[in-house]
Amino acid sequence: PYTTLFRSTFFFGSDFIVDKHVLIPRPETEELVSWILEKVDTKQPIKILDIGTGSGCIAIILAKQIAQAEVYAMDVSTAALSIAKKNAEANGVVVQFIEASILEWQSQDMFFDIIVSNPPYVRESEKEMMSPNVLNYEPHLALFVDNNNPLLFYKAIVEMSKINLTSEGLIYFEINEYLAEETKSLFSSTFFESVQLKKDIFSKNRMLCARKC
């Protein structure tokens, strides 16, 4: 694709380096960032964790838009974090990067007011619906999950939220439109309330927000 060849793309008014190790930021992700900024008091100190940061686009834009935010960004990929660090520097923001898998990461002393994630959620069985450009040029690690456990990463984030998300804290996700109700039910059945689905510009349920009780 054009952006892969030129190793650069535009997201939320800013330039980002991309390569084969990170997903190319998409319009739906801009919508997710906009939703967060609509609901958050951008003048108050706030601590944010972006899980599966990839190019760093979500974390970096939130750091740029929320002056008093303390932003952390996690990814399992060393190569992706290298790109994200370059993007943070190029955009003039401070983001604390964590190299870890959310499936294994544990901390007893890190607490966040907002957790945001665009985790892998495309089932292997949905590959045939994907564009060849995506399949050939973007990291499968960041895209696909097993057909038998497609909510794996959401379940892991629920678990870590027991400790690491503050009371009244918010979570924001991109989700699989075909698993929207299942994803909503996952959060509604735990310690989250006010679970909301949000449609993207194509009227597909692609985002979810919930508040910790």
Model-derived features: where do they sit?
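Conserved beta-strand segments that form the floor/walls of ligand-binding pockets within enzyme
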Residues: I17, I61, D75, A142, ...
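Mobile active-site "lid"/loop adjacent to the S-adenosyl-L-methionine
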Residues: Y121-F153
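Conserved SAM/SAH cofactor-binding pocket of Class I
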Residues: E28-M129, A156
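Extracellular beta-rich repeat passengers
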Residues: A67-A69, A210-C213
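Conserved beta-strand segments of alpha/beta enzyme cores
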Residues: D15, E70, V94-Q96, E193-Q196
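Conserved Class I SAM-dependent methyltransferase catalytic core
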Residues: N147-R211
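Conserved AdoMet
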Residues: P1-E38
